[in-house]
Amino acid sequence: MARQRPRVLAVASGGGHWVELMRTRPAFSGAEVAYVTVRREYGAEVPGCRLHVVRDATRWSRLGLLRMAIQVFWILLRERPDVVVTTGAAPGFMAVRMAKWFGARAAWIDSIANAEELSMSGRLAGRYAKLWLTQWPHLAQAQGPYYAGAVL
């Protein structure tokens, strides 16, 4: 039996990444959306949606990244999204990196805070994301990332 609505897994770490992800919510109209973030209190902003909380980790903590990657893997396994959308950082990269394993397409929207160059996660995500976006026109390139406007 085919799904009635597409399933979206929206992923962002804390702070500005989460704020930017919240600005993309109108694009998910009509979809079944689940969220992944690093702070449980963000659940108040997405009532009626499933919220998964993963540990926050940086590139400086390999063990922390491994634990977070395992958490993201299990979330993808349970949610089985059609699409993964993220504004970064580490949890979003992990989700984009693994999305294809589950047959999901992935979209990376690099944070508007990265005005001079793409974030490290954003540069890495370009290899795996079906849609790879920057919010700064001067950072766009012919092979990606592409510019389609800003969310803030």
Where are these regions (language model features)?
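Residues at the starts of beta-strands that form the adenosine-phosphate
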Residues: 7, 32-35, 50, 105, ...
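N-terminal subdomain of nucleotide-sugar transferases
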Residues: 1-38, 42
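Short glycine-/acidic-enriched loop or helix-start segments at secondary-structure transitions
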Residues: 19-22, 45, 94-97, 118-119, ...
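Active-site-proximal region of nucleotide-activated glycan assembly enzymes
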Residues: 104-152
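Conserved nucleotide-sugar phosphate-binding/catalytic loop shared by glycosyltransferases and other
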Residues: 12, 30-71, 138, 148-151
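Histidine-centered beta-alpha loop that forms part of the nucleotide-sugar donor binding/catalytic region
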Residues: 14, 89, 110-113
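Glycosyltransferases and closely related glycan-assembly transferases
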Residues: 73-83, 91-107, 123-127
